[in-house]
């Protein structure tokens, strides 16, 4: 166990793995998985490690997916992109804008790789991946069989997909298909974007505004290790939301399809006066309460303790129980993040 995982997770938590393998194509990925499995080892496939918290040393092989490549098909109604899972997400967003293919600008600066984007159904500022996803290409690890799932088959939900359930361990994502409509329509429902004029705004202006909001509010993982939003924004019933708003009328709330209401986890945490709170080397970020940071050589236990404290305080004040968006990795694979911090 002497391969440090510190360079492979944006939290900068220092645990080890038995083996770390970089796979630059599908065959290398399959070979690494099949070799490790034959040895009886657990296997974890990572992109940029921007949404994981390692709780302890990993007793197996970590495969870093570095499958690259971007192919573009120009159709009358849309541009269709076939993108390797190992491509950096933000670089893809910049590239599509430079090439005059807008549609991803609200998702600028989301850390991580393209292959991770469907797992979480990444989203920001009113847009989720499912809006632009055409398909996801996977490989069945045991057989090498290729499978293409349509966007519908991916069963996208809020920070959720089939890749967190049936497809979690048996398949690896090798490419993502995107469909960017030529009739561009800006999404200006959140934050500073609401100030932009929908009749004159350009994709580049939306991109610039999103980048500005993210860089001013969110810490740079190279300075303070973090995994972006630590908690999901809770989605509650209309009754729960109504009761909460009666008591806290200024609480941000976003009605969802089906009658439920999404609340802002960052606001709930902020109302508990937790910004800047520190436990061991972990802290709640001072600008954006939704982000927990590695302030000073944090151990995973520090982050877990802090997350538990935040969850308890918010639960006691609002009777709303936050769930981590970050995936928790134990010695032999993913464990329940909610149970870990409960």
From Swiss-Prot:
This is UDP-N-acetylenolpyruvoylglucosamine reductase. Keywords: Cell cycle, Cell division, Cell shape, Cell wall biogenesis/degradation, Cytoplasm, FAD, Flavoprotein, NADP, Oxidoreductase, Peptidoglycan synthesis. Belongs to the MurB family. It is found in: Cytoplasm. Its cofactor is FAD. The lineage of its organism: Bacteria, Pseudomonadati, Pseudomonadota, Gammaproteobacteria, Enterobacterales. The gene is murB. Its EC number is 1.3.1.98. Cell wall formation. The keyword Cell wall biogenesis/degradation applies. Pfam families: FAD_binding_4, MurB_C.
